[in-house]
């Protein structure tokens, strides 16, 4: 739904929605706007119930009448199953008072919530799961702060993707651009936040699953330092890299969430990680040259403009080489795959037809990783991690 301009955008929308539901045109309004321009507005009654509204601007180009702009208002669903697995008003009520009182949360379908099963983006896995007896600390912390759970939001299967599509439940819409992928694997929480259906997305990030959907949908996303936020009650993909993070529409909400969750109970404080309070840390940023140079020209230009604004504000922005990106990627891929197979391989092997093609291919590749390869990759990660830690120190690592 939304405004579509141009043949490409209209074709992309038609392709993404997976066909047109059976419907009957109840009425059409036609208004000529000139010899080669016409406006059509129609009301449809769907066979399965509900009505929709469609507005089309037609133009005669080279003797052919084409739709050059359109607006589609589909029938209103109870809730969008591509975004939500379970939704309530609220699903869980938070504390009546607290710094996050009045805000709602979309929880990625990997976190334990008492009384609910973890579905991991796969219906067969959901069917075989048992209801959780406790709630994950990352969820409970938000409830204690006054936020309420709006619902359980979709994820790419087992969080083993960053595209945002799901072959079982459909692809959540992109709240910033019609027809575009939402980004994953935290696709459901990101789209829920982008569409205003939740204020906070509680998500995970192993290889970009907070940052990618936030980027695709114009949101604020934070991948926290590995181990900073408790991961108990989280279905893992790869423990060496899994992190808990949040997605919001604005920086102030993200700051409020982080201030609470990074100072509560089991979360390590800024002082314990950096040896200094947040207010004492320098306004300093670190840009890896190889990552910056790998970006597309338009992205690189926007990123450089941000760096210039930061520098103009008095910040220190350092551009430093981190070495060949392939070294990082290969070591990461092997360790991630080995851990993913240990976590989910037994279930995947027992349900060979239950996983979508893209994720199934990743699991097949993961199953082929040998212990020797994993040991070698873990050994390779040690100096790479040490190098990044030494370069970052008390600076903020910034990537385009």
Feature roles, as predicted:
Residues 76-100, 263-400:
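Amidase signature
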Residues 51-77:
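Short beta-strand edge/turn micro-motifs at domain boundaries
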Residues 105-108, 142, 344:
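Conserved hydrophobic/aromatic pocket- or pore-lining residues that grip, position, or stack substrates
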Residues 71-131, 135, 158-160, 272:
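Short, well-ordered alpha-helical
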Residues 5-51, 55:
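Surface-exposed, charged secondary-structure patches
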């Amino acid at each position: 739904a939304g405004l579509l301009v141009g043949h490409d955008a209209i074709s992309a929308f038609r392709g993404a929605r997976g066909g047109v539901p059976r419907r009957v045109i109840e009425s059409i309004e036609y208004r000529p706007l000139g010899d080669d321009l016409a406006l059509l507005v129609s009301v449809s009654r769907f066979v399965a119930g509900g009505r929709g509204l469609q507005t089309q601007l037609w133009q005669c180009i080279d003797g052919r009448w084409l739709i050059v702009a359109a607006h589609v208002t589909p029938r209103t669903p109870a809730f969008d199953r591509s975004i939500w697995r379970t939704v309530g008003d609220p699903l869980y009520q938070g504390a009546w008072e607290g710094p996050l009182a009045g805000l709602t949360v979309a929880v990625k379908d990997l976190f334990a919530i008492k009384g609910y099963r973890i579905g991991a983006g796969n219906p067969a896995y959901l069917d075989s799961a048992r209801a959780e007896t406790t709630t994950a600390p990352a969820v409970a912390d938000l409830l204690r702060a006054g936020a309420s759970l709006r619902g359980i939001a979709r994820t790419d299967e087992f969080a083993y993707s960053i595209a945002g599509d799901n072959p079982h439940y459909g692809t959540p819409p992109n709240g910033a651009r019609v027809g575009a992928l939402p980004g994953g694997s935290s696709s459901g929480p990101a789209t829920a936040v982008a569409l205003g259906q939740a204020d906070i997305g509680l998500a995970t990030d192993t290889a970009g699953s907070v940052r990618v959907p936030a980027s695709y949908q114009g949101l604020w996303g934070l991948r926290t330092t590995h181990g900073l936020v408790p991961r108990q009650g989280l279905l893992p993909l790869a423990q060496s890299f899994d992190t808990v993070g949040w997605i919001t529409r604005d920086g102030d909400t993200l700051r409020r969430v982080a201030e609470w969750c990074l100072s509560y109970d089991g979360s390590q404080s800024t002082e314990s990680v950096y040896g200094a309070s947040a207010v004492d840390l320098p306004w300093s940023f670190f840009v890896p040259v190889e990552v910056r140079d790998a970006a597309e020209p338009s992205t690189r230009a926007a990123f450089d403009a941000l760096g210039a604004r930061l520098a103009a504000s008095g910040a220190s922005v350092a551009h430093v080489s981190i070495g060949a990106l392939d070294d990082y990627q290969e070591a990461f891929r092997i360790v991630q795959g080995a851990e993913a197979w240990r976590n989910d391989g037994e279930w995947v092997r027992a349900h060979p037809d239950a996983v979508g093609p893209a994720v199934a291919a990743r699991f097949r590749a993961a199953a082929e990783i040998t212990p020797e390869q994993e040991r070698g990759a873990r050994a390779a990660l040690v100096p790479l991690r040490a190098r990044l830690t030494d370069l970052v120190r008390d600076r903020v690592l910034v990537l385009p």
